[in-house]
Design a protein with these regions (language model features):
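Conserved kinase catalytic-core segment
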Residues: 1-49
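C-terminal catalytic region of ATP-dependent kinase domains
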Residues: 30-151
Length: 151
């Protein structure tokens, strides 16, 4: 779930929020579960549709601010370790995405009516060093205030 939260911060996904997870949990044999990510129609930040800059999702809109996150992340020490491990991999994940960007964009359904070419500049922003640093800082902050030190 931490990967999903970081992904949402990176893309500024406003569609998955503390009260609209857009996730399905399926129980499988052996007491395990599979988490499915669903409903990605509104994954792109609403500022993408307008002549605005990319904006981070708010802490209130982050899945890290959900009851589900509070339930899943009970062990502060383990959560911090997982966060640090994930952030070490974050540049690799984003580079992999950038390397495969055209293939990924080709999979965006036509029915979403997104003119990807007109959003190229904003899409390119998510790969900049500044944006990645902002996302890392925001992710750490949201974990600290929404999970570790939640009132």
């Amino acid at each position: 779930m931490l990967k999903i939260a970081l992904f949402d911060i990176w893309l500024s996904n406003e569609d998955r929020t503390f009260n609209n997870y857009n996730l399905l949990l399926q129980a499988i044999k052996g007491g395990f579960s599979i988490l499915y990510i669903i409903d990605n129609t509104e994954i792109f930040n609403s500022s993408m549709a307008y002549d605005q800059s990319m904006e981070l999702i708010t802490q209130d809109d982050s899945i890290l601010n959900s009851k589900l996150a509070t339930f899943v992340f009970k062990n502060d020490t383990e959560t911090v370790r997982e966060m640090n491990d994930l952030l070490k991999e974050f540049p690799i994940f984003t580079k992999n995405c950038q390397d495969n960007l055209q293939s990924i964009l080709n999979q965006v359904p036509q029915k979403w009516h997104i003119d990807l070419q007109s959003h190229k500049t904003k899409i390119d922003i998510i790969f900049t060093e500044d944006w990645l640093k902002i996302c890392e800082h925001t992710f750490r902050k949201y974990i600290q205030t929404s999970i570790i030190h939640k009132p």
